[in-house]
Curated annotation (Swiss-Prot):
Pathway: Polyol metabolism; glycerol degradation via glycerol kinase pathway; sn-glycerol 3-phosphate from glycerol: step 1/1. ATP binds at residues 12-14, 266, 309, 313, 410. It is an enzyme of class 2 (transferase). Its EC number is 2.7.1.30. ADP binds at residues 12, 16, 266, 309, 410, 414. GO terms for biological process: glycerol catabolic process; glycerol metabolic process; glycerol-3-phosphate metabolic process. This is Glycerol kinase. It comes from Bacillus cereus (strain Q1).
Length: 496
């Protein structure tokens, strides 16, 4: 009896395997962290083999602890840290360099050159993205330009490229399936989101051979099966793939046009479903593909904040202000306000709507009376201000006024932050019972492909609210606070 869907959630700092049942409930999960490599300031890399090892480990742990046999699994859904690029040898299956992570700024110079050559408008029109080190295309170019012999091998058709989803499907299927889905392809800087094809003009710009690229498929279909020895003697269908933020939008059942979610993970990502039309942004947002399912493609507007949960980690590990991230709420609640203190956590630059990779973090309004509590509160508040920056851009571009914001990710457990978020946005914030919406979205996509769930209506019924945070702050106060944040941003940008 096929009782479960297995979701593999390959994130920036850890890999997880989560088993879901028919009601969309978590049966069991396992997690394993892996090494972050920082070869130079601003560079972030992962070992793709270590990521693969961590995936095998969490599958084994999750199934054995839950006492679930592989033959009870109806299908596998995969969701992944997006943009992170892997290039590997087709024959040996070994990566030729570390995976270059989405956060890494090592291709900033390549991006500057492309902008100087006047490619920005063409890239914007075709991909919905900006020329930025964040996206995969320049990472692939960097690997081909900097690893000895790589370009020659690529031109001979001996190398393969993939985002993490592609790497995992390739490994799980024993090298049979070299595929990605629309949502991940739309983040590469090489994919035309309107005609849904790899784009020759973009590939020429980046000097990336087409033979390296995976086949682009819908987000919900059977791409292949696991090979026996990776899945303990069973061929299980690999049936759903979506980038982490798009998977969360799906897991939050944001199927209607104008519905939006914000995920508070390492970074913060807000996506609004714009239906079957790609809305071009005038305000520094990205136009991206949400998912492809049932022969249709849905688009989304996205705002990306580079530093969110990682700011809380920095308070814990870098500043040693507390031992556990959950303590940040306790400290922040001990003071009535930040007493005029603002923290701008631009550790790796600023994302939407500013897109400035040269800016670094800053703190303003500090006095002799500033305490640890003020500092922690100001850091938490910065997540809410950055989210408001994104929402203002979204409402301006889409012409849709947000009614409620659905939230997920590690930081949403923080009630102080969620209440402040609602106050600053002046809209209700809804936290679901199942916070693992990214993994759930991948599970839903896989389950729909194998007939485990009937349709999106059945899934919509499974979304349940844990808590709704209503705005109660006076408009005058929230506007004043936000004006202070805008001043802090301008001052941060001036200091370069």
């Amino acid at each position: 009896m096929k009782k479960y869907i297995l979701s593999l959630d390959q994130g920036t700092t850890s890999s997880r395997a989560i088993l879901f049942n028919k009601k969309g409930e978590i049966v069991h999960s396992a997690q394993k962290e892996f090494t972050q490599h920082f070869p130079k300031p601003g560079w972030v890399e992962h070992n793709a083999q270590e990521i693969w090892g961590s995936i095998l480990a969490v599958i084994a742990t999750c199934l054995s602890e839950a006492d679930v046999k592989p033959e009870q699994i109806a299908g596998i859904g995969i969701t992944n840290q997006r943009e992170t690029a892997v290039v590997w040898d087709k024959t040996t299956g070994k990566p030729i360099y570390n995976a270059i992570v989405w956060q890494s700024r090592q291709t900033a110079e390549i991006c500057d050159e492309l902008k100087e050559k006047g490619y920005s408008e063409m890239v914007r029109e075709k991909t919905g993205l900006l020329i930025d080190a964040y996206f995969s295309g320049t990472k692939v170019k960097w690997i081909l330009d900097n690893v000895e012999g790589a370009r020659e091998k690529a031109e001979n058709g001996d190398l393969l490229f993939g985002t993490i989803d592609t790497w995992l499907v390739w490994k799980l299927s024993g090298g049979k399936a070299h595929v990605t889905d629309y949502s991940n392809a739309s983040r590469t800087l090489m994919f035309n989101i309107h005609d849904l094809q790899w784009d020759d003009e973009l590939l020429d710009m980046l000097t990336v051979p087409k033979s390296m690229l995976p086949e682009v498929r819908p987000s919900s279909e059977v791409y292949g099966e696991t090979i026996d020895y990776h899945f303990f003697g069973q061929n299980v269908p690999i049936a759903g793939v979506a980038g982490d933020q798009q998977a969360a939008l799906f897991g939050q059942a944001c199927f209607g046009e104008g519905m939006a979610k914000n995920t508070y993970g390492t970074g913060c990502f807000m996506l609004m479903n714009t239906g079957e039309k790609a809305v071009a942004s005038e305000h520094g947002l990205l136009t991206t593909i949400a998912w492809g399912i049932d022969g249709k493609v849905n688009y989304a507007l996205e705002g990306s904040i580079f530093v969110a949960g990682s700011a809380i980690q920095w308070l814990r590990d870098g500043m040693r202000m507390f031992k556990d991230a959950s303590e940040s709420e306790v400290y922040a609640s001990r003071v009535e306000s930040t007493d005029g203190v603002y923290v701008v956590p631009a550790f790796v630059g600023l994302g939407t709507p500013y897109w400035d990779s040269e800016v670094r973090g800053a703190m303003f309004g500090v006095t002799r009376g500033t305490t640890k509590e003020h500092f922690i509160r100001a850091t938490l508040e910065s997540l809410a201000y950055q989210t408001k920056d994104v929402l203002c851009a979204m409402e301006a571009d889409s012409g849709i006024e947000l009614k409620t914001l659905r939230v997920d990710g590690g930081a949403v457990k923080n009630n102080f932050l969620m209440k402040f978020q609602s106050d600053i946005l002046d809209v209700p914030v809804e936290r679901p019972v199942i916070n693992e919406t990214t993994a759930l979205g991948a599970a839903y996509l896989a389950g729909l492909a194998v007939g485990y769930w009937k349709n999106q209506d059945e899934i919509k019924e499974q979304w349940h609210m844990d808590k709704r945070f209503e705005p109660t702050m006076e408009a005058e106060i929230s506007e004043e606070l936000y004006a202070g944040w805008k001043k802090a941003i301008e001052a941060t940008k001036a200091f370069k």
